[in-house]
């Protein structure tokens, strides 16, 4: 037996003892944050002795960005990776530059991987140019495109020899727009790696221990696995040790699998029950633990609530969106969307499905050839057919011009196939095979769709192995439908295009009643370059003649501008459109007297561009992926905007 009387008395006395509020406060702080005290002895906090707080980039950051830098460094040191997922327009590039400066101060080589269209966002800050506000920091990081990962010969646009580059020497890799790697390595074939796998094998796993900082305002596209694939770059595809370090009850693969299952159930709930709070209650604690420990994600509301806005300046107020639903044509008895859809629904698109017409005795021969990657020959064909069907509907929603051009290209593909079959029938063919399973050119497919066909390739099918008579019959039936549709939409010219006329009306109203004083700028987004060409041709003439406005077009195929003095280059055009945010007078003083009022663009500028001089954005078509819409809004809804409100 052991006498515990004294211990009990002491405990009761301590419970009833009067303690100073300060002591209670400190004890509470200790209980909440004690685990972080271990960090001090584990070398995962920023090393203040490096003097990174004296750098130019650090002193250009707002307080919320400085907090992000410190958190990112801690997460990189602790978990080897971090996703900076602040909302669009909150300055992720500058935050990342401060992290880069810290690691360069530690003599780490740094690689920045970015989309080609965003190269100027990065090469400005490591170059000796007049518009580099942090030139004194002498940043030395390398810049490569995402696509350079797949190249084995030649030099990068920045002059790096890709065949001799020491990929494994980088201590830090910064991936801008990391959601482009969200599909992971699942689509790779046995003999060819995709970009994700090349990044993992050549850069991250090889050589020195590499830390990975990922930047994306939209790391999740439509499934939680998108986030998991990006985080896998940080744990090198080996989740076991990472799960232990995060102190998860389940391994990280299970965490994301469960989260996706929960989300799927939540998405099927009635609308009144499908709330954010309901989803949060359904997800398990491990999922939130992962998010908390390896991501930094703040919204505009978070910044407004927890930081001094007098230093940052107010964000522009978002006016309620204005939806417009114009008809296809101003002519009352013209064809409508429903009638076109019924015609499209009758198409078999047999021209893209030749393997469906193989003789049964020949099917095994082509099954062995396969389609590459995880796609069989038939699966590849089915994918192309579905993409073409979707593409027709998306282009119809975009503009009657884009739809008509697509029909004409489709008809040409059908006519070419019919000629090939006829030559085979008459014995005039120089070759007797048709190409199967490849994406056709000239259809402006979304990059997400093209990525699915990144590996593998087309297969040649001999006509003698096919029931080419049935194939010819079905192609001919489709061609008849396409000809009918072309005839029906050809009457809808720009003077009868209700959607185009509605856009011109919006521009006129904006100019006559600006939402901010003297601001006449309008940014128009479309998913297709054909639509952008069509809009530029018609809107620029209207804007110039009737409103005295200058107009420009920016697509992946090139630029154009009504101001002949402005070079048809993206950066020059955007500098004249948004001269304050793009520092036009410093970057291009020869263009200081030229201003552009309207820019019509594809999604080639929906990421990473600072265009906040503009206060009015029009989605001429709605991209199927809502993430793209968020990115479009982020071009004008940004920190540092001088506009009181945006539309």
Task: List each language-model region with its residue ranges.
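Conserved Walker A/P-loop ATP-binding site and its immediately adjacent core
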Residues: 95-98, 106-129, 219-226, 526-533
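Conserved Helicase C-terminal RecA-like lobe
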Residues: 41-61, 313-331, 336, 345-595
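ATP-dependent helicase/translocase motor core
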Residues: 1-87, 94-106, 124, 168, ...
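Conserved helix-turn-beta segment of the N-terminal RecA-like "Helicase ATP-binding" lobe
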Residues: 117-141, 234-238, 538-546
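Inter-lobe coupling linker of SF2 helicases/translocases
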Residues: 143-173, 177-180, 185-210, 214-219, ...
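A short beta-strand element within the Helicase C-terminal
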Residues: 226-229, 610-621, 646
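Conserved two-lobed SF2 helicase motor
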Residues: 139-156, 168-171, 576-607
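Conserved segment of the helicase C-terminal RecA-like domain
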Residues: 635-647
């Amino acid at each position: 037996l052991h006498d515990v009387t004294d211990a009990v008395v002491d405990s009761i006395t301590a419970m009833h003892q009067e303690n100073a509020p300060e002591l209670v406060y400190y004890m509470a702080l200790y209980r909440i944050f004690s685990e972080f005290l271990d960090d001090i002895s584990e070398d995962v906090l920023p090393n203040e002795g490096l003097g990174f707080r004296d750098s130019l980039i650090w002193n250009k950051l707002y307080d919320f960005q400085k907090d992000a830098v410190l958190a990112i460094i801690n997460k990189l040191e602790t978990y080897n990776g971090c996703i900076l997922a602040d909302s669009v327009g909150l300055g992720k590039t500058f935050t990342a530059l401060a992290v880069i400066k810290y690691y360069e101060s530690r003599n780490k080589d740094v690689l920045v991987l970015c989309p080609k269209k965003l190269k100027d966002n990065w090469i400005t800050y490591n170059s000796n140019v007049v518009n580099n506000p942090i030139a004194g920091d002498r940043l030395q990081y390398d810049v490569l495109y995402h696509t350079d990962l797949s190249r084995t010969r030649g030099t990068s646009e920045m002059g790096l020899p890709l065949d001799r580059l020491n990929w494994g020497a980088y201590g830090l890799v910064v991936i801008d727009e990391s959601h482009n790697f969200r599909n992971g390595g699942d689509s790779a074939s046995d003999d060819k790696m995709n970009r994700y796998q090349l990044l993992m094998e050549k850069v991250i796993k090889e050589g020195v221990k590499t830390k990975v900082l990922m930047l994306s305002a939209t790391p999740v596209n439509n499934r939680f696995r998108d986030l998991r694939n990006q985080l896998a770059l940080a744990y090198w595809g080996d989740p076991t040790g990472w799960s232990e370090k995060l102190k998860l009850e389940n391994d990280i693969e299970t965490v994301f699998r469960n989260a996706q299952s929960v989300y799927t159930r939540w998405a099927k709930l009635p609308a009144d029950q499908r709330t954010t709070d309901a989803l949060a209650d359904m997800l398990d604690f491990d999922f939130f633990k992962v998010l908390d420990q390896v991501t930094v994600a703040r919204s505009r509301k978070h910044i407004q609530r927890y930081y001094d806005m007098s230093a940052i300046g107010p964000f522009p107020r978002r006016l309620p969106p204005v939806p417009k639903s114009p008809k296809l044509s101003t002519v009352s008895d013209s064809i409508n969307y429903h009638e076109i859809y019924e015609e499209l629904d009758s198409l078999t698109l047999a021209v893209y499905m030749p393997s469906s017409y193989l003789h049964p005795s020949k099917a095994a021969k082509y099954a062995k050839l396969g389609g590459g990657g995880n796609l069989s020959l038939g699966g590849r064909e089915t994918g192309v057919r579905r993409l073409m069907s979707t593409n027709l509907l998306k282009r119809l929603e975009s503009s009657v011009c884009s739809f008509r051009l697509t029909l004409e290209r489709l008809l040409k593909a059908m006519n070419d196939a019919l000629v090939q079959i006829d030559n085979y029938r008459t014995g005039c063919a120089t070759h007797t095979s048709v190409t199967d399973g490849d994406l056709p050119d000239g259809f402006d497919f979304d990059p997400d769709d093209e990525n699915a066909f990144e590996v593998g390739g087309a297969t040649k099918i001999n006509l003698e192995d096919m029931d080419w008579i049935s194939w010819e019959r079905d192609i001919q039936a489709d061609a008849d439908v396409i000809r009918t549709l072309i005839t029906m939409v050809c009457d809808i010219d720009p003077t009868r295009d209700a959607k185009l006329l509605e856009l011109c009306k919006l521009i006129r109203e904006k100019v006559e009643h600006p939402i901010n004083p003297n601001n006449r700028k309008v940014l128009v987004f479309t998913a297709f370059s054909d639509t952008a060409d069509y809009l530029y041709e018609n809107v620029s003439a209207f804007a110039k003649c009737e409103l005295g406005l200058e107009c420009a077009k920016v697509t992946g195929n090139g630029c154009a501008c009504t101001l002949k003095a402005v070079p048809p280059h993206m950066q020059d055009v955007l500098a004249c459109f948004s001269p304050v945010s793009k520092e036009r007078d410093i970057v291009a003083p020869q263009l200081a007297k030229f201003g552009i009022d309207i820019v019509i663009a594809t999604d080639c500028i929906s990421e990473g561009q600072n265009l906040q001089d503009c206060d009015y954005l029009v989605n001429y078509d709605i991209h199927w992926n809502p993430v793209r819409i968020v990115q479009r809004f982020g071009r004008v809804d940004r920190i540092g905007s001088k506009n009181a409100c945006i539309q």
